[in-house]
C-alpha cells in the first residue's frame, strides 16, 4: 500500500480547522495525537447502537459488547505480537500500567536492600512509581546517566547491575529527545543478572512495529491516545507466567471469583483480575479502531514517511539562528529546542499566534531538564499526518520570532 499523507489528513477532521485565522499546524502529537473519523465513528456507533455493561450479562447487547471488547484485546496482542491475548491488561494509560506493575509485581518482589534501575531520560510516569516503591520497601533507585547528545551512557549500565537488581524500567523512545534506546542488548543484560524489564512504549508504538516476543521484555506498556485512539485507555503487556503470579492491586467487581464475608475473597484469573469495575468499553472500542486504522496504513510505511519528514525538519531547522536542538541526529517523533535565551513559553505563544501548536515546559521530565540546565524546552512532534509544508511554517515562524525578539 502506498502511503499518502493527503489521504491520511482527510481522515482527521480537526486538521481542517484554523487557529488565529491560520490553518492549524498540529505539532503536538507526542502529547496526544488527533483522532481519525474512523475512531470517532466507531466509539460513537458503539454508544448509539451497541452499549451495554460487559461480562456476565445474558442479554444480546451485553454479550455483543463483551465480544467486541475481547476482540480488541486479541487485536492489540497481534499489534505487538504477544504470545496470547491473555497477556494484555486494559489500563487507563501508560501511567496506570506502570503503577499497576509497581504496586502488584513490585510489592511482591522488591525488598529492602534491592535495587531498581531507570534512566535519566525517563518520563515522570516511569520515575515516580519506582521512587514510591523504593521508599515503601527500603530499596535503592539507580540511574543510567545521559550523554550530552541525548543518548544514554550505556557503558555504565553493567556496573549498575548486581545480585540485588530486581528491575530495569526503561523508555523505548524518549518523549523529549526522541532517542530510541537499544532495548535488545539492555534486556539481554538485565536477564543475565536475573532482573525483569519494563519498557515504557508510549512514544514508540505509533512510529514503527513493536514485537514484544522478539524484545523478550517482561512488561510493555503504552497509551491509546498517542496512537490516534481515545483518551483513558491503554495496554499493559505482561509475560503470562509473571501475570498469573501477580496479585491484584485494586478490588471490586469483575476481578473476583468468589466473595464471602466469612471466608474472604478469591480472584478470577489474569488478565481480568486486574480490571476491577466497569471498564472503559467505549474507549476500548475506539482503541480497536485506531489499531485497525494504523495497521491498514502499515507501520513500516508510516515509519518511512515519518523518518523522511524528520530528516527534512532537522535539516531545515539548521537555518534558524540561535536555535539549540536537544537529542541525537537519529531520533523518532520529537524535536526539542530552545531559541536563544527566550523562555519556551514565550516561543510557544508566538508559534500559537501563527497557528502552530507545539508543547512547552518540562515535558514531565524534570531530571532531564536539570541535566541540560534549562527550566523548559519547546517540543515539536511529527506524526504521520504532518507535512513538509508544516515543517516550513515552523521554521519560518522561528525565524520570525528571532527577528522580533533578537
Swiss-Prot record:
The keyword rRNA processing does not apply. PROSITE patterns: AA_TRANSFER_CLASS_5. GO terms for molecular function: cysteine desulfurase activity; pyridoxal phosphate binding; selenocysteine lyase activity. Disulfide bonds: none annotated. This is Cysteine desulfurase. It comes from Escherichia coli (strain SMS-3-5 / SECEC). NCBIfam families: PRK09295.1, sufS. Pfam families: Aminotran_5 (PF00266). One of its GO terms (biological process) is cysteine metabolic process. The modification N6-(pyridoxal phosphate)lysine is found at residue 226. Its EC number is 2.8.1.7, 4.4.1.16. The keyword Transferase applies. HAMAP family: SufS_aminotrans_5 (MF_01831). It is found in: Cytoplasm. Pathway: Cofactor biosynthesis; iron-sulfur cluster biosynthesis. Keywords: Cytoplasm, Lyase, Pyridoxal phosphate, Transferase. Belongs to the class-V pyridoxal-phosphate-dependent aminotransferase family. Csd subfamily. InterPro entries: Aminotrans_V_dom, Aminotrans_V_PyrdxlP_BS, Cys_dSase_SufS, PyrdxlP-dep_Trfase, PyrdxlP-dep_Trfase_major, PyrdxlP-dep_Trfase_small.
